[in-house]
Amino acid sequence: MVELTEIKDDVVQLDEPQFSRNQAIVEEKASATNNDVVDDEDDSDSDFEDEFDENETLLDRIVALKDIVPPGKRQTISNFFGFTSSFVRNAFTKSGNLAWTLTTTALLLGVPLSLSILAEQQLIEMEKTFDLQSDANNILAQGEKDAAATAN
């Protein structure tokens, strides 16, 4: 969208003197060449401004690229990304299933196994404690026999 605004000079222009016919033609040619240079600059600016859309999104720009890439190349790129995304999706699905299987197996087999190992260790500790108590009782019993024998 182009907006036109009028710019007024701050300088007050005085009445221009009358020129002769030749001077007027020379002035017109000079101003025409100056205007052409200015018009060329304005044209290049206006071309850019005409093509620029402030409301254009990234998606609009990507869709516009469709015209640049040939259909055969687009199909090749689409197939490649389709295959890659399918491969990655399947890999994550399979790895997730494997992780779930291993975790469930570890819980179903590992927890009871660890509990039975812990119970076995407690049983071994209790046997050691009973053996130490019986050895202590035997030593005390032998000491009492020796004390009773010396007393008689």
From Swiss-Prot:
What domain of life?
Eukaryota
Question: What broad class describes the main subcellular location of this protein?
Answer: mitochondrion
Outline which residue ranges sit on the Cytoplasmic face.
Answer: 2-97
Q: Outline which residue ranges sit on the Mitochondrial intermembrane face.
A: 120-152
Q: Which residues carry this modification: Phosphoserine?
A: 44, 46
Could you list this entry's UniProt keywords, alphabetically sorted. Answer: Membrane, Mitochondrion, Mitochondrion outer membrane, Phosphoprotein, Protein transport, Receptor, Translocation, Transmembrane, Transmembrane helix, Transport
* Pfam (any one): Tom22
One GO-annotated biological process of the protein: protein insertion into mitochondrial outer membrane
InterPro entries cross-referenced by the UniProt entry: Tom22 (IPR005683), Tom22_fungi (IPR020951)
Q: Where is the composition biased (Acidic residues)?
A: 37-49
How is the subunit organization of this protein annotated in UniProt?
Forms part of the preprotein translocase complex of the outer mitochondrial membrane (TOM complex) which consists of at least 7 different proteins (TOM5, TOM6, TOM7, TOM20, TOM22, TOM40 and TOM70). Interacts with TOM20 and TOM70. Interacts with FCJ1.
List other remarks.
Present with 6610 molecules/cell in log phase SD medium.
Record's comment describing the protein's domains: Its cytoplasmic domain associates with the cytoplasmic domains of TOM20 and TOM70. Its intermembrane space domain provides a trans binding site for presequences and the single membrane anchor is required for a stable interaction between the GIP complex proteins.
Protein name per UniProt: Mitochondrial import receptor subunit TOM22
Species of the source: Saccharomyces cerevisiae (strain ATCC 204508 / S288c) (Baker's yeast)
